[in-house]
Structure formats: C-alpha cells, structure tokens
C-alpha cells in the first residue's frame, strides 16, 4: 500500500497543491507554519477522517465555501483515485475511481494510514472521549462493518437525544423511545464486541513496545470499561445486545428525567496505567 500523488484545493492553508511521492521514504521539511502537518493531515484524511478537526468545515480555507482532495493510491494490488469534496453547510462527497461512497468507512477499507503527531498526547490529557475516538479511528480502518455500525449508532444517538430533550414539551415523542433504544442496542453491541477484541490484541502488543520506549522503567496496562450489565465484552453481539437492552430498561426513567442518553457504548472508556515495575 502506498500513496503516489496528492492534489489539494483550499484545504487548510493550501490554495492549490500537487505533490508526488516516492514509493519508499519521503522527508517533508520546511519552516514553521508552512503546512507540513496540514499535508500529513490531508494524506490521513484519505482514510476517511481528520486526526484533529471535529468538523469538516474546519478543513476548508477561510473565505471560501469548499475544499477538494484527490489522492492516487495503490492498494489491494491495484490503483485507486480517492476524492473528497468538502462544502460548508453540506455533507461531504467521497469517491473511489469516480464511484460515490456512502461514508468514510469505505475509504478506510481501501487506504489505511497511521499518523503519529504531538497531538497524540490528547489520549492522556483529554480522557474517555478522546480514547473512544482513537478506538473508532483504528477499528474503522480494520473492520468496515464497524464503521457502518458506528455511523448508525451516532445517527440513532442523535435522534434519541432529540426525543429526550423535546419530550417535556411533546410527551408523545416518548412513544418512539423504545424503538430507538432497541436499534441503538443492536448497533452498540457490535461496537462493544469489536472494541473488546481490538483492545485484547492491543494488550498483547503495546506493553512490550511501551517497555522499550521507557527503557523498562514503566509497565503499561490497558483495560476496557463498558456498560455495567455487559459481563463479557468479547461475547457475541447477540449476547451483548440482550445485556444492553437490560441496561437501557434499567435507566429508562433516569434518561427521561435527565433528558440525556445515559446508557450505551458512547460512554465507554479505555483505561490505562503505566507504573514503574517497582511500584
């Protein structure tokens, strides 16, 4: 897998850029604030997501209404032209070899990228939400089914939140609450299942690498914390689905009272410790 070329229009600080890359190692250098990190961000965006922008509109240059990215990549033993059109106030448009894609998960199924940057410290500083984002970014590139389930869960979560928020003025909205809870549990069960298995693999590889970085002075441990009724996050999605339904039923009254979604994997956390072996 490699990227051979990149074209940008109105992306971050680039009015226009055409770049070609060597198939081996490329060194990108320049003065501060010239756009080195923006260039790397654009490459990573071809996997479907920005590592630092919460909204796509943040990627569009100030004073214009759109931005375009094109990447020539080689993957799956063939060439791909990946394209992204970003518009203020409208959904982005993604294409692969001219064919419109449904979501960023389909991009990540073609081109997988790994980006290391100073902002990675946010995994430590920012807490559970940032770590969930890390899990989502990684697993979406590995499991297209996860990307679809994540997009569906986010859509359902947004709708259910709206129902709870507006139910005080329109109590009839609560008639749809159980249907949304069931659909969220179905999508959420897949998220928990895939997250648990990814973290299991991460636990097998990360401690040794972390130990090398710390010169053996620290020992990394990772633990996945999810909905309390889920007894085994590595179980099959159907088992987890039933346990999520139980948790949602137990929290139904509290959700209505607080007008918030209190139950589901949107509150998951990846916990870590890195003590000295002497501790």
Regions found by a protein language model. Give the residues of each.
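N-terminal pre-Walker A segment at the start of P-loop NTPase domains
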Residues: 1-15
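Conserved P-loop NTP-binding catalytic core
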Residues: 11, 15-96, 145-146, 153, ...
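Nucleotide-state sensing region of NTPase/ATPase domains
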Residues: 47-130, 136-142, 146, 203-208, ...
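An accessory alpha-helical subdomain
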Residues: 122-214
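Amphipathic heptad-repeat alpha-helical coiled-coil/stalk segments that mediate oligomerization
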Residues: 196-270
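Conserved small/polar residues in nucleotide/adenosyl-binding loops
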Residues: 272-279
